[in-house]
Curated annotation (Swiss-Prot):
Gene3D superfamilies: Ribosomal protein S11. Belongs to the universal ribosomal protein uS11 family. It comes from the Bacteria. The lineage of its organism: Bacteria, Pseudomonadati, Campylobacterota, Epsilonproteobacteria, Campylobacterales. HAMAP family: Ribosomal_uS11. GO terms for cellular component: ribonucleoprotein complex; ribosome. The keyword rRNA-binding applies. GO terms for biological process: translation. Part of the 30S ribosomal subunit. Interacts with proteins S7 and S18. Binds to IF-3. Keywords: Ribonucleoprotein, Ribosomal protein, RNA-binding, rRNA-binding. It comes from Campylobacter hominis (strain ATCC BAA-381 / DSM 21671 / CCUG 45161 / LMG 19568 / NCTC 13146 / CH001A). One of its GO terms (molecular function) is structural constituent of ribosome. This is Small ribosomal subunit protein uS11. Located on the platform of the 30S subunit, it bridges several disparate RNA helices of the 16S rRNA. Forms part of the Shine-Dalgarno cleft in the 70S ribosome.
Length: 130
């Protein structure tokens, strides 16, 4: 029997100059996604993906590492300007935003907080009793 040749598609890296960094900072983790202006994901990272486990995922240091990892992946696509959209009340929120400004070769164009606020919609979960 003849061997079958398996053809693989070549991954072509797009050259994208502008993008948007979405930072989702929850109480347990920090997720970072870099997209183009249309919203197509280019690179992503999170504290959990960088092998921070348990309570270490929610630290500001883990958030900083996640941002640096995602932006280094995005730099390979040619990102030079980014806008920042932050969501959530997590502890790594401010550190993540500051670390974007510290990365060389990346210019921040805008900053927006997109945390959803309820206008007396659904009833919140019951209070925790410890």
């Amino acid at each position: 029997m003849a061997e079958k040749k398996i053809l693989k598609k070549k991954v072509v890296k797009k050259s994208i100059a502008k993008g948007i960094v979405y930072i989702s900072a929850t109480f347990n983790n920090t997720m970072v996604t870099v997209t183009d202006e249309m919203g197509n994901a280019i690179a992503w990272s999170s504290a959990g993906a960088l092998n921070f486990k348990g309570s270490k995922k929610s630290t500001p240091y883990a958030a900083q590492q996640a941002v640096e990892d995602a932006l280094n992946k995005a730099k390979e696509h040619g990102i030079k300007e980014v806008g920042i959209k932050v969501q959530g009340p997590g502890s790594g929120r401010e550190t993540a935003v500051k670390s974007i400004g510290a990365i060389e070769g990346i210019k921040v164009t805008f900053f927006k907080d997109i945390t959803p606020l309820a206008h007396n919609g659904c009833r919140p979960p019951k209070r925790r009793r410890v």
